[in-house]
């Protein structure tokens, strides 16, 4: 589990939430509960995934792209252009948030997801 333990260790530039003892304890616990084989698969998947190519332009369903402004791997400068490639996608940029947006700012993510559900329901009614 050591190769991913850095997710539980705050660094300069991390969100306020990620620097709290509660976040550190929660994330450390979650990581320690994982099967090492599953973590190895996750690492291989992350580094071996292909580029998206033209896939985003083919998405026609209501979509949501969420990004934490402090996310080192998928921050708004990466995710906003992705959202712009998806017709009708909503983009949410969460201030003072890193990679674990649903853990760091659960209320913001929940509101965004509820909004997406309403958009899906409206699309179904109008189909």
Identify the meaning behind each predicted range.
Residues 27, 43, 82, 109, ...:
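Hydrophobic "lid"/C-terminal helical patch
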Residues 54, 77-81, 104-108:
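Generic recognition of short, well-ordered alpha-helical segments
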Residues 87-127:
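Catalytic active-site module of serine/aspartate enzymes centered on a nucleophile-bearing elbow/loop
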Residues 58-59, 65-67, 71:
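Short beta-strand/loop motif that positions the catalytic acidic residue
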Residues 1-58:
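Conserved alpha/beta-hydrolase catalytic His-Asp/Glu region
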Residues 56-60, 84-86:
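Short, conserved loop/helix-junction motifs that constitute active-site signature segments
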Residues 31, 71-74, 98-101:
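Glycosyltransferase donor-binding loop in the core domain
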Residues 23, 72-78:
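Conserved alpha/beta-hydrolase "acid-adjacent" motif
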């Amino acid at each position: 589990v050591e190769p991913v333990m850095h997710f539980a260790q705050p660094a300069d530039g991390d969100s306020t939430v990620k620097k709290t003892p509660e976040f550190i304890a929660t994330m450390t616990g979650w990581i320690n509960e994982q099967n090492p084989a599953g973590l190895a698969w996750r690492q291989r998947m992350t580094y071996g995934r292909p580029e998206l190519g033209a896939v985003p332009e083919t998405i026609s369903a209501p979509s949501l792209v969420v990004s934490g402004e402090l996310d080192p791997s998928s921050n708004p400068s990466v995710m906003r252009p992705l959202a712009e490639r998806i017709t009708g996608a909503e983009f949410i940029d969460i201030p003072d948030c890193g990679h674990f947006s649903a853990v760091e700012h659960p209320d913001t993510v929940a509101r965004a997801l509820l909004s997406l559900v309403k958009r899906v329901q409206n699309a179904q009614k109008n189909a």
